[in-house]
Amino acid sequence: MFGSSGFGNKSMFGGSNISTSTTTPAANTTQNDDFLVDGAPEDTIQVIKFSPTPQDKPMLACGSWDGTIRVWMFNDANTFEGKAQQNIPAPILDIAWIEDSSKIFIACADKEARLWDLASNQVAVVGTHDGPVKTCHWINGNNYQCLMTGSFDKTLRFWDMKNLPNQTQMAQIQLPERVYAADVLYPMAVVALANKHIKVYNLENGPTEVKDIESQLKFQIRCISIFKDKSNQNPAGFALGSIEGRVAVQYVDVANPKDNFTFKCHRSAELVNGFQEIYAVNDICFHPQHGTLVTIGSDGRYSMWDKDARTKLKTSEPHPMPLTCCDVHSSGAFLVYALGYDWSRGHEGNTQPGSKIVIHKCIEDMKPRPTKK
């Protein structure tokens, strides 16, 4: 289903180094050899992403509800430097790196998608919707490149970057509901909608819908992440997280329906006033080498899972605030997650000061356990 073909002409931005701004002190070490990144925004961090390159000195970017997007450089196992920051006049809902890490796309609540050129430190509007832009993903195809944005205006739009500063829309897909979450692992794209349906697209010849899958989850979808097949070569399916403390594992082309399943997570171990406390799954990431996954929740914990063995690998101790978003570095060595208020208890529940960013060494924690004979 997911091979290769053409769609437009490939356009290259080219690569350049980031211009260095003020440097923050070295990160502070926390328990279990985790590392606290200095200079986190005050407001809730909505999205956090490692850069694709370079492997030895990756960068880290986060977008916040206060409209700030920040970039750090990872120098060694204990030291992070703040490199750059931009202030956007709207909450930031998503970000996406370009493949050479020279630029970042920004999805904003003011109905605009922006591009931040790190070398020139300039920000330009590259796409516009009729509602808040909830998701953005850079598609680096075999024969074309473009930005994919999903919005509360019930559309998925694709933008050509060759004619900047002019906005050039390559395609638009009308959807039955608002976009709540999306992911891209070329040539697959998945888009989770407010009606709990997931649209699956093949991107090889331009965006072509190949499936409409109804979620196994009964409650609102919060996050979605694509996983590869067991050979770790091609995209095979996706995992969904919901506000009900549950994850669904769904294959796109499933030989055995029993391969699709759900599991409970991010719930209190003890009953509270006779009831179990249930927390939202705020983000999901797959390990690039092991194929295992990490979930983070409003309970302030992260948990690591082996979906093939259907076992839990690890659950963290509780943090004092919800975990709002996460990412795993392409080397598989590091998990980054953000702490902050996730608004699950409304305005009156916002008593937690500021946000925090933590780096966790995860390559051993996320390694599948040997099967018992």
Curated annotation (Swiss-Prot):
Record-level GO BP terms: mRNA transport; protein transport; RNA export from nucleus; transcription-dependent tethering of RNA polymerase II gene DNA at nuclear periphery
Gene Ontology cellular component annotations, sorted alphabetically: axon; nuclear pore; synapse
InterPro entries: G-protein_beta_WD-40_rep, WD40/YVTN_repeat-like_dom_sf, WD40_repeat_CS, WD40_repeat_dom_sf, WD40_rpt
Main location: nucleus
Tissue expr: Expressed along the ventral and dorsal nerve cords.
Keywords assigned: Acetylation, Cell projection, mRNA transport, Nuclear pore complex, Nucleus, Protein transport, Repeat, Synapse, Translocation, Transport, WD repeat
WD-type repeats, residues: 40-82, 87-126, 128-169, 276-315
PTM-bearing positions, type N-acetylmethionine: M1
Subcellular location field: Nucleus, Nuclear pore complex; Nucleus; Cell projection, Axon; Synapse
Pfam families tied to this protein: WD40
Presence of the UniProt keyword tRNA-binding in the record: no
One of the record's GO molecular function terms: RNA binding
Known partners and oligomeric status: The nuclear pore complex (NPC) constitutes the exclusive means of nucleocytoplasmic transport. NPCs allow the passive diffusion of ions and small molecules and the active, nuclear transport receptor-mediated bidirectional transport of macromolecules such as proteins, RNAs, ribonucleoparticles (RNPs), and ribosomal subunits across the nuclear envelope. Interacts with rpm-1.
PANTHER family: MRNA EXPORT FACTOR AND BUB3 (PTHR10971)
Free-text function comment from the UniProt entry: Functions as a component of the nuclear pore complex (NPC). NPC components, collectively referred to as nucleoporins (NUPs), can play the role of both NPC structural components and of docking or interaction partners for transiently associated nuclear transport factors. It is specifically important for nuclear mRNA export. Has a role in neuronal development, where it acts downstream of rpm-1 to control axon termination and synapse formation in anterior lateral microtubule (ALM) and posterior lateral microtubule (PLM) mechanosensory neurons.
Similarity field: Belongs to the WD repeat rae1 family.
Record protein name field: mRNA export factor rae-1
Source species: Caenorhabditis elegans
The encoding gene: rae-1
